[in-house]
Every structure is written in C-alpha cells, then in structure tokens.
UniProtKB/Swiss-Prot annotation:
Organism: Methanococcus vannielii
Annotated gene: mcrD
UniProt signal peptide: none
Protein name in the entry: Methyl-coenzyme M reductase operon protein D
Record note on quaternary structure: MCR is composed of three subunits: alpha, beta, and gamma. The function of proteins C and D is not known.
Keyword Calcium in record: no
Length: 160
C-alpha cells in the first residue's frame, strides 16, 4: 500500500473537496481517502457568543459517490491510500486541476495500521482484535464514532 499526503496551500471549499473525493474514488487503485482540517463546531464553545450556532458558509453536506457526507471541517489536508504506485500521476494531475493556488504531494507513511493503547482504552481488547483494519487511524479516540467516520463503498465500476 502506498500513502500520499495532499497538502493544499489553502483550506478547501466544500465543492472542491467534493470534486476531489469523487474524482479520487473513481481511480481503480484508491482504497481510502482521509480528510483532515479545522473543525467547524455546531455551537460556539467560548466567548461572548457561547452557545449560539456556528453559521459557517462551508459547513455543508456533500455527496461522495452517492453517499451524503456532512462536512464538519475545513479540509486542509488529505491522505490517499493507494494499492500501488500506478496512479500517482493521475492524483497529481487532479491536484493541478483542482488546486490552482498550489499544493504539496508527498509520498510516505501517514496512517497507522496497528492498534494503539488509545484504541484498547476506547474500544476494549476484544473489539480491537476484531476491528476492521480500515477503521484504524480513521477516528479520534475522544470523538463520537458515528460523527467522525463516513465509510464510502468502493464500487466495482472504477474508471482508469
């Protein structure tokens, strides 16, 4: 497995994120894409406006391969897991098309593939032993699972 980090030079708008995810998942070697960025909470957590709703223009629902995904963050980085190196150039071309303001594409190890102590504390030993390896590194142990992970099924009809 090959891991790529796509680091755009600006936060991405919801439409750009949606375009990137739909295009990336259309490639046959893309196994998973993890998005990371600044959280957009539902309510203001502190200050004079504490408790009032956050009405951010980029807090939207996007559709990735027909699956609705509530975007609760401003995407600042994407990690792409590939089966092999054959489509790295296609990912680079996609980034050139969608990110005219610039980006950095790095090949390396960004996602963990073995359970950590936090996983054992959060889920328990029996759950960690039976967990789907795709879920490792997909969520923060302090977060509520249903709110932080959205599984997008990989269809058999991928284009090259």
């Amino acid at each position: 497995m090959i891991e790529l980090e796509v680091f755009p030079h600006r936060y991405l708008k919801a439409e750009t994120t949606e375009n990137f995810l739909n295009s990336a998942y259309s490639f046959s070697t893309v196994e998973r894409v993890v998005i990371h960025g600044e959280s957009l909470p539902k309510k203001v957590g502190y200050g004079p406006a504490k408790g009032s709703p956050v009405n951010h223009s980029e807090k939207k629902e996007i559709t990735v391969k027909g699956v609705p995904v509530e975007l609760n963050l401003q995407v600042g980085r994407l990690w792409v897991l590939l089966k092999d190196e054959s489509e790295i150039e296609k990912i680079d071309e996609l980034c050139k098309e969608l990110f005219p303001f610039g980006y950095r594409l790095t090949k390396g190890k960004f996602l963990r593939d073995t359970p950590t102590v936090s996983d054992f504390i959060k889920y328990g030993e029996s759950a960690v032993e039976n967990i789907d390896p795709k879920l490792l590194s997909a969520t923060d142990p302090r977060s509520k699972f249903q709110n932080s992970v959205k599984m997008i099924p990989k269809s058999e009809n991928s284009t090259e």
